[in-house]
């Protein structure tokens, strides 16, 4: 029998997601949990659900064997408060890649709650470059050494610009929301551009009006830059492109309630989000 299994039975968000699968599929026991050592012995047609990059070995093994999986993690926008309200769910990847055109309703609702999500255009008169460093989890996932990446990135930037470079490390959550959020730092430090490996900070930077440069695949890719040689001549997507991208982001993330009532899975399937 085809099975849908989850690796961590103690994760509340993952439990919500698995409950939602049951709502949609009516599978007799989609909320089956097991250890990866047991799951990996099952047919690779059996899908699994995991949450967080600490499962990097499992995800890489799924890619290798072509086992389908759903990946759950922090949402892209709207989490600028103490508690994470939004969670992204991706099939067979860790961030969404395929931009599709979707309705505006979810974005409009988010912008009503979080006015800072309204894109106000590009800030082209900034001064410094904000270098957002990768945290330990993505470093392990992508086999990147944080210090080496910082040194190499700064060295590369200095070949093409003499702008000040401000390094921002990931700190505990309560210190990076509110006044500690990237939105605030971009304004207070007069940031010109943001450079990161694959942080959601790239998304936040673009929404705040500064071009972002990324080193690994991210959901910011449709409107971000990659070649640091272009740091003084970045791509500035037009308003229509930003609007389409933001609408898509809003459809790629869900509340705990949407995870558990099945709406998250329904949206993923109906909109063919990947």
Segments from the language model and where they lie:
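Conserved small/polar residues in nucleotide/adenosyl-binding loops
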Residues: 1-5
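Well-ordered, non-membrane alpha-helical segments in soluble/globular domains
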Residues: 11-21, 52-57, 145-159
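Conserved catalytic-core segment of nucleotide-activated headgroup transferases in glycan assembly
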Residues: 121-174
């Amino acid at each position: 029998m085809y099975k849908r299994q989850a690796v961590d039975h103690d994760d509340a968000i993952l439990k919500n997601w698995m409950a939602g699968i049951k709502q949609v599929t009516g599978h007799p026991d989609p909320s089956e949990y097991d250890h990866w050592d047991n799951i990996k012995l099952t047919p690779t047609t059996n899908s699994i659900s995991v949450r967080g990059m600490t499962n990097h070995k499992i995800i890489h093994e799924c890619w290798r064997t072509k086992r389908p999986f759903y990946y759950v993690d922090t949402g892209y926008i709207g989490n600028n408060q103490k508690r994470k309200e939004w969670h992204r769910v991706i099939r067979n990847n860790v961030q969404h890649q395929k931009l599709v055109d979707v309705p505006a309703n979810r974005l409009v609702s988010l912008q009503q709650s979080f006015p800072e999500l309204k894109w106000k255009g590009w800030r082209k008169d900034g001064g410094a470059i904000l270098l957002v460093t990768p945290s330990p989890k993505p470093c392990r996932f992508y086999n990147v050494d944080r210090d080496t990446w910082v040194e190499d990135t700064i060295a590369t930037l200095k070949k093409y610009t003499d702008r000040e470079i401000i390094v921002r490390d990931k700190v505990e959550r309560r210190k990076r929301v509110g006044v500690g959020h990237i939105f605030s730092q971009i304004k207070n430090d007069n940031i010109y551009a943001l450079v990161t490996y694959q942080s959601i900070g790239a998304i936040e930077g673009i929404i705040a009006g500064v071009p972002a440069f990324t080193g690994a695949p991210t959901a910011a890719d449709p409107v971000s830059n990659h070649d640091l040689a272009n740091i003084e001549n970045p791509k500035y997507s037009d308003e229509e492109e930003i609007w389409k991208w933001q609408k898509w982001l809003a459809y790629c993330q869900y509340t705990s309630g949407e995870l558990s009532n099945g709406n998250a899975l329904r949206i993923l399937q109906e909109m063919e989000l990947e």
